[in-house]
Amino acid sequence: MNIKRNKPNILITGTPGTGKTSLAGVIASNNEMNHIDISSAVKEKELHDGWDSEFQCYILDEDKVCDEFEDVMVKGGNVVDHHGCEWFPERWFDLVIVLRTDIKILNDRLEKRNYNQHKITNNLDCEIMQVILDEARNSYKQEIVVELPSTTLEDNENNQNFISQWIQNWYEKNN
């Protein structure tokens, strides 16, 4: 289902530590869009079902999140970041970016966050098995899912340029 809006919605997803929040913030700021950090919103707006002590994070309530952001997403102009992607309504997004990071670099990033070893191992396994990429490919039209490397500063700059160009092309095509 295509929804006509004046600005696109973009999902930036990937394993924790791939740079989603940083990239989403820059893209939103540079393109006069809203940045929606789902993990922060879950905590701040209590869109969860409690705390998972094993993974040391809140248990996201997908229905609460969708209810909270439905009206905002319909309007467009949002850059959403979250490590999961398969549960969002497909109609919300015009572009789905899946960030991928070299395993050694990802491990270092997760250790710097003081993740416990179980959580680090789980996230590294997800990256190795390309779980998020497969979820995106299985949940959204193939033509809107783009896999981008996110290991180096050069990758980050290239990703910013790619997404900004995509946004410009979207405006030309849709307005």
From Swiss-Prot:
Annotated residues for binding of ATP: G17, G19, K20, T21, S22, R113
Chief location of this protein within or outside the cell: cytoplasm
Gene3D superfamilies named among the record's database cross-references: P-loop containing nucleotide triphosphate hydrolases
EC number: 2.7.4.3
Segments of this protein annotated with the region LID: 112-122
One annotated GO molecular function: ATP binding
GO biological process assignments: maturation of SSU-rRNA; response to oxidative stress
Source species, domain of life: Eukaryota
Stretches the record annotates as NMPbind: 37-60
Location of this chain's protein in the cell: Cytoplasm; Nucleus
GO CC, alphabetical: cytoplasm; nucleus
Keyword Nucleus assigned: yes
Quaternary context: Monomer and homodimer. Interacts with small ribosomal subunit protein uS11. Not a structural component of 43S pre-ribosomes, but transiently interacts with them by binding to uS11.
Function: Broad-specificity nucleoside monophosphate (NMP) kinase that catalyzes the reversible transfer of the terminal phosphate group between nucleoside triphosphates and monophosphates. Also has ATPase activity. Involved in the late cytoplasmic maturation steps of the 40S ribosomal particles, specifically 18S rRNA maturation. While NMP activity is not required for ribosome maturation, ATPase activity is. Associates transiently with small ribosomal subunit protein uS11. ATP hydrolysis breaks the interaction with uS11.
PANTHER family listed in its UniProt record: ADENYLATE KINASE ISOENZYME 6, POS9-ACTIVATING FACTOR FAP7-RELATED
Full protein name: Adenylate kinase isoenzyme 6 homolog
The organism of origin for this protein: Dictyostelium discoideum (Social amoeba)
Taxonomic lineage from the root: Eukaryota, Amoebozoa, Evosea, Eumycetozoa, Dictyostelia
